[in-house]
Amino acid sequence: MAKFANILETIGRTPVVKITKLAPKGINLYVKIEAFNPLGSVKDRLALGVIEAAEKSGELKPGQTVIEATSGNTGIGLAMVCAAKGYPLVVTMAESFSVERRKLMRFLGAKVVLTPAAERAFGMVNKAQELAKTHGWFLTRQFENEANPDMHARTTAREIVDDFKGERLDYWVTGFGTGGTLTGVSRVLRKERPDTKIVVCEPADAPMLSSHIAQERNPDGTPAKPHPSFKPHPMQGWSPDFIPKITAEAVDMKVIDRILTIAGADAMKCSRELAQKEGIFVGISAGGTFAGALEVCKTAPAGSTVLAMLPDTGERYLSTPLFGDIPADMTEDELKISHSTPSNRLAPKAA
């Protein structure tokens, strides 16, 4: 086992795993499991990339407070990076995102400022901008910062190219949050693997890319207002209520071969099936990407190779509908197993 100088050196180099039970016959279906990053999501890459770029440029000063708007995963990644490097961190987050996320960030030393659920991502971004300007804090601007896709071009994309060197890679399937993974990896695949088709998934409730309606922007690239095609959806971390500038770059580059819309119920079904049939424990957005990959498989020629990105672990979804039907108490079947032998039974609960 390798030795590392600090936790940040362990970011990246996540495994590509073949799907054995859920893959359609005749298709080689793989997933890249970003939960293997130290804080459990693909956003660990972004967090390190934007902080190191700001240090190099001089934008971020020693001891300066860092601030970002986040649905959770970027904030968790930033909390790890800031703890390791010695920067205070404040995150703004809509109150609708899972409680686990805010607790994880606070456990890592960050301060979490909640914004009204009705104001969605637009509200938490506006609050972060306001706080940064008022207090002189460094705003990482994950939705516009070029260090985000650059990090994915240097790491995620290189890993994919290396893992499939000399082999077929017919389809690469991803979702989008900031668009960093989509745009960064697409830049490299278009140059080095032009044969690979790039497929992007988005929520059926928020078909912003599918609508072909342009996002209204301020001069600095930030959204001027929410996108008209957005409606709330259960895929936390996917598709904020605007099209990020970084995502729009991939659209403008015309690197996307296909856009799929995914229903929330299908995303959660795939998350559960990955856990129970493949032993792969991921969140709702990963289930959404996997649902998209299965859709691609339906029309892919025999022998095709499909790779889907799985952005995060499932543990930060315990309080969400993904776990809504998972009981804390023993089920009837579990009680029957318990009662099949005479000892060490729990006492019946009072009525």
Residue ranges and their predicted role:
Residues 1-64:
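Positively charged, low-complexity intrinsically disordered leader regions
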Residues 11-13, 125, 136, 191-284, ...:
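Active-site/ligand-binding loops adjacent to catalytic centers
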Residues 52-59, 76-88, 106-107, 186-193, ...:
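Alpha-helix C-terminal capping segments
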